């Protein structure tokens, strides 16, 4: 079972990825993890990627595709894999297809932008312990204070509303077109495409996913 998970940052992909991995015994493949592992192992592709990154440049799609092919040929991918954060663009999706990397299921978790902003910009963290709160969904007993120590809570830079909106804008510009792309691939009978409402409870989304991934 070869799966691509699409959705904006904060849509809940990580939670559902965990469910899919546990339920179906397939690994989650993240391009970041893959790059780090290849560089550490000193593989030919890893050495090439290190050279590019050391020069402060972006790793090319061809190099990433090479790493993906290398990774999915490993033993733990025999039953399939879950691609996380890749492809991000249509050229990357085209390159995957050109390299014979077929996908069985494309899953989109759809959450409106304003809901994502509410979810992410409402997070508060206690820097000392890493305890996480949410002003709406899991508020501290005293506003702005950690329940245990009474110390001030902070907003992580990634959760600042302006940062969240920037990340959403990049998603809509680069990755959202993949929804239409894979819709066409599915219409041609080459994959299955399913969209889920990510504003539902985690359990409801997992249940619907399981019914599609039988």
UniProtKB/Swiss-Prot annotation:
A GO CC term attached to the entry: cytoplasm
Q: Where is this region: LID?
A: 122-159
Pathway recorded for this protein:
Purine metabolism; AMP biosynthesis via salvage pathway; AMP from ADP: step 1/1
- Which SUPFAM superfamilies does the annotation name? P-loop containing nucleoside triphosphate hydrolases
> Which InterPro entries does this chain map to?
Adenyl_kin_sub, Adenylat/UMP-CMP_kin, Adenylat_kinase_CS, Adenylate_kinase_lid-dom, P-loop_NTPase
**Location within or outside the cell:** Cytoplasm
Which leading EC class covers this enzyme?
transferase
Which Gene Ontology terms describe the biological processes this protein takes part in? AMP salvage
Q: Which GO terms describe its molecular function?
A: adenylate kinase activity; ATP binding
EC numbers for this chain: 2.7.4.3
Q: Which domain of life is it from?
A: Bacteria
The record's NCBIfam families line, in alphabetical order, gives: adk, PRK00279.1-1, PRK00279.1-2, PRK00279.1-3, PRK14527.1
Q: What does this protein do?
A: Catalyzes the reversible transfer of the terminal phosphate group between ATP and AMP. Plays an important role in cellular energy homeostasis and in adenine nucleotide metabolism.
Similarity-based family: Belongs to the adenylate kinase family.
Q: What is this protein called?
A: Adenylate kinase
């Amino acid at each position: 079972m070869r799966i691509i998970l699409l959705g904006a940052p904060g849509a809940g992909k990580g939670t559902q990825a965990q469910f899919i991995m546990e339920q179906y015994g397939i690994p989650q493949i993240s391009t970041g993890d893959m790059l780090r592992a290849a560089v550490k192992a000193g593989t030919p592709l890893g050495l090439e990627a290190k050279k590019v990154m050391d020069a402060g440049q972006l790793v090319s799609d061809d190099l990433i595709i090479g790493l993906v092919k290398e990774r999915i040929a490993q033993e733990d991918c025999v039953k399939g894999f879950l691609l996380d954060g890749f492809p991000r663009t249509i050229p990357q999706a085209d390159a995957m297809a050109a390299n014979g990397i077929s996908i069985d299921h494309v899953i989109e978790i759809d959450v409106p932008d304003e809901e994502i902003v509410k979810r992410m910009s409402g997070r508060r963290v206690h820097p000392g312990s890493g305890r996480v709160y949410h002003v709406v969904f899991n508020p501290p007993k005293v506003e702005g204070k950690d329940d245990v120590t009474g110390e001030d809570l902070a907003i992580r830079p990634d959760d600042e509303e302006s940062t969240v909106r920037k990340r959403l804008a990049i998603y809509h510009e680069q990755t959202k077109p993949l929804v239409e792309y894979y819709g066409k691939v599915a219409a041609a009978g080459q994959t299955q495409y399913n969209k889920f409402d990510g504003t539902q409870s985690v359990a409801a989304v997992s249940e619907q996913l399981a019914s599609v991934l039988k």
